[in-house]
Amino acid sequence: MKSLITLILTLFLFVGCSSDSEVIPPIMPYSYSTTELDLINKVNDYRTTNGLSNLQPVDHIGYLCSEHNQNMINTTVVGHHDFESRINNLKMTMGAARVSELVAGNFSTNQSVMSAFLNDPLCKKILDEQDRNRIGVAVSISPTGRKYYTLIIIN
């Protein structure tokens, strides 16, 4: 009986006191639409015109952008809800040191959303950051026809 109690206590100590290691999320595939690729090209055209390097599209970042768009569609709120989880995901999966997110809603064209980003000082500052090298984009349309945009830029 004493050995059974010792065994149970030992198992508890190994199981109950083991460290929780973080689980690295899977890297998800994503296929960019023509509209999304056009928006990435507009971002890169702006950057090269201003002496900055192109941002490389990454499928996993696009997937996270698409997930965020679905959240914005479901809540009808354009914002950065749960941005911290996207930051943590990209740090663990992509080794991102810095993560920035741009969101927009209800613009009819990529050119109009780019103009809005460039007219907003904070968004423009993000687009102008030299140390960024990767991008993900999603453009989603709600059942009511409203467009939602998420761009995530990392280094």
Label every PLM stretch briefly.
Residues 13-16:
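C-terminal motif of bacterial Sec signal peptides marking the signal peptidase cleavage site
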Residues 66-111:
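Short, surface-exposed glycine/acidic/tryptophan-bearing loops
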Residues 1-10:
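Sec-dependent signal peptide recognition
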Residues 49-63, 76-87, 124-140:
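Surface-exposed patches in mature extracellular/periplasmic domains of secreted proteins
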Residues 23-74:
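A short alpha-helix/helix-coil micro-patch that ends at or immediately precedes a cysteine
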Residues 104-155:
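Disulfide-stabilized extracellular recognition modules
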Residues 48, 97-99, 132-133, 147:
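Loop/turn elements at helix/coil->beta-strand transitions in domains of secreted/extracellular proteins
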Residues 37, 41-45, 62-70, 101, ...:
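Solvent-exposed, polar/charged alpha-helical surfaces in well-ordered, non-transmembrane soluble domains
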